[in-house]
Amino acid sequence: MSAQPNPKAFPLANAQLTNQILDLIQQAQHYKQLKKGANEATKTLNRGICEFIVMTADVEPIEIVLHLPLLCEDKNVPYVFLPSKTALGRACGVSRPVIAASVTTNEARELNAQIQAVKNEIEKLLI
């Protein structure tokens, strides 16, 4: 593994935000508000049910997730890169690495406050 994250992976979350996002992803998985994988994330963006997108910076080649930031900017959805695909896979509750995930909207809204807090943090990174 390379020590330096890919420079194309912008914005990259710091350690505190990474932990906050991974915790929220675990809860979103519990409430069935999580889609795993680049293709599923693309579908949620196109359907307009996406709260925010998480991608990983250690994807090889990085180009397989770089279509997502463009879509996010078109749809006005916040997005962020995390350092580790293995950690994202664990948070998603699967045994394999996950390169992208999408937290989706839900009528029940148990996670609304946490989702809004994370979206605000991500938007601060994008400025």
From Swiss-Prot:
It is found in: Nucleus, Nucleolus. GO terms for cellular component: box C/D methylation guide snoRNP complex; nucleolus; precatalytic spliceosome; small-subunit processome; U4/U6 x U5 tri-snRNP complex. InterPro entries: eL8/uL1-like, H/ACA_rnp_Nhp2-like, Ribosomal_eL30-like_sf, Ribosomal_eL8-like_CS, Ribosomal_eL8/eL30/eS12/Gad45, Ribosomal_eL8/Nhp2. Gene3D superfamilies: 3.30.1330.30. The keyword Nucleus applies. GO terms for biological process: maturation of SSU-rRNA; mRNA splicing, via spliceosome. SUPFAM superfamilies: L30e-like (SSF55315). GO terms for molecular function: RNA binding. Keywords: mRNA processing, mRNA splicing, Nucleus, Ribonucleoprotein, Ribosome biogenesis, RNA-binding, rRNA processing, Spliceosome. It comes from the Eukaryota. Pfam families: Ribosomal_L7Ae. Common component of the spliceosome and rRNA processing machinery. In association with the spliceosomal U4/U6.U5 tri-snRNP particle, required for splicing of pre-mRNA. In association with box C/D snoRNPs, required for processing of pre-ribosomal RNA (rRNA) and site-specific 2'-O-methylation of substrate RNAs. Essential for the accumulation and stability of U4 snRNA, U6 snRNA, and box C/D snoRNAs. Component of the U3 snoRNP particle. Binds to the C'/D and B/C motifs in U3 snoRNA. Component of the 25S U4/U6.U5 tri-snRNP particle, a subcomplex of the spliceosome. Binds to the 5' stem-loop of U4 snRNA. Belongs to the eukaryotic ribosomal protein eL8 family. This is 13 kDa ribonucleoprotein-associated protein. It comes from Cryptococcus neoformans var. neoformans serotype D (strain JEC21 / ATCC MYA-565) (Filobasidiella neoformans).
